[in-house]
Amino acid sequence: MITLYNTLTRQKEVFKPIEPGKVKMYVCGPTVYNYIHIGNARPAINYDVVRRYFEYQGYNVEYVSNFTDVDDKLIKRSQELNQSVPEIAEKYIAAFHEDVGALNVRKATSNPRVMDHMDDIIQFIKDLVDQGYAYESGGDVYFRTRKFEGYGKLSHQSIDDLKVGARIDAGEHKEDALDFTLWKKAKPGEISWNSPFGEGRPGWHIECSVMAFHELGPTIDIHAGGSDLQFPHHENEIAQSEAHNHAPFANYWMHNGFINIDNEKMSKSLGNFILVHDIIKEVDPDVLRFFMISVHYRSPINYNLELVESARSGLERIRNSYQLIEERAQIATNIENQQTYIDQIDAILNRFETVMNDDFNTANAITAWYDLAKLANKYVLENTTSTEVIDKFKAVYQIFSDVLGVPLKSKNADELLDEDVEKLIEERNEARKNKDFARADEIRDMLKSQNIILEDTPQGVRFKRG
């Protein structure tokens, strides 16, 4: 039984899907005017884990994440680079797939784009105007916020609270300062589309409402995104969607915490703005992913090199223990009286599932993985090992790897295959027996250059990848 924290109700709730065995999930994606930063990577990774865990529990997940390919930032970038908005969007959509692919994020079921849904957006806005929820003014179209009675229910703010500080900017023609834009009148030189309201382009909030509606229907199970989107973006999505669809927009709302850089908010002005495109050249993407899930998704996370190094060390510990298990699989036998270890492995798996069922607590799930590694390290020191126990270890390691999306072997592990390493170790042993120490040292140095470290153990020479 999976429980998750619902921002809408401010409490944990048992997940009950609209359709048995199926999860309809919408995650707000990036505005594709630049490479994504690590703040964008966090929701991509966190909600990928959520999806993976639902699938592990037998659900069919329809996972939709959009691309905002029409926006003020894109238009500004287009003018700076003297390139068309579609050209820039295509470049950074491709870059997004490359970056999150390196972080082992699975491809979405669908990645809708605003430009592909322009006719749908225009019709959606027209429907809202016809229903009295929106109005045209000065070439723009605005949503009548006060007409939607539930406005503020996600961010838990009242209309009176929101009215304080609300204002009408120059050039706006709103009836009320709280109203927000659905359609923007075209400006000279900007990309625009024909509509019943005149030339223009959609506002940001309406885009997600329409794409979610056309991809997943009037009501979805889970809508997710960063905490910064809770208000006004997600609040406005609810207002538009529920006014139009006459049905709840999403049953569960999930929001992930912020990322700080050395305990400071990430911003261009502070010079601590980190692009995934750049950082994965310096930090192993598997380590970056492991670091991101080492903290519960709703908690803020602090990024610095010391903490990333700690994550690298922790992942290495897990991988080294798995390598030991794989090595012992070669000499394991069918021996009895191993139920104690089977029971201990099952207990760790049960704990992993328990903490993941509790609002996808990846931090505690990783603790369970460490405990599995500790037990594995203990088991391989036994004089004899059981095929049944070794297979059980391998199966549970694979479950943890699949759910958390962290591979059991480094992407560089195939530079020199394990069997090739074993052959070189045998050759080195023979060289040492024959007192050919020059050759033995040559092999050791060659392995070291491949980041392979040799260790003498009671069972003979073994290796690990550094």
UniProtKB/Swiss-Prot annotation:
Entry keyword Cytoplasm: yes
Cofactor binding summary note: Binds 1 zinc ion per subunit.
Pfam entry (one): CysS_C
Gene Ontology annotations for the cellular component aspect, listed alphabetically: cytosol
Residue ranges annotated as motif 'KMSKS' region: 265-269
Gene3D superfamilies registered for this protein in UniProt: Cysteine-tRNA ligase, C-terminal anti-codon recognition domain (1.20.120.1910), HUPs (3.40.50.620)
GO BP annotations listed: cysteinyl-tRNA aminoacylation
Subcellular location: Cytoplasm
Cofactor(s) listed: Zn(2+)
Motif 'HIGH' region: where in chain: 30-40
SUPFAM superfamilies the record matches: Anticodon-binding domain of a subclass of class I aminoacyl-tRNA synthetases, Nucleotidylyl transferase
Catalytic reactions on record: tRNA(Cys) + L-cysteine + ATP = L-cysteinyl-tRNA(Cys) + AMP + diphosphate
Cystine connections: none
Protein name: Cysteine--tRNA ligase
Protein's gene: cysS
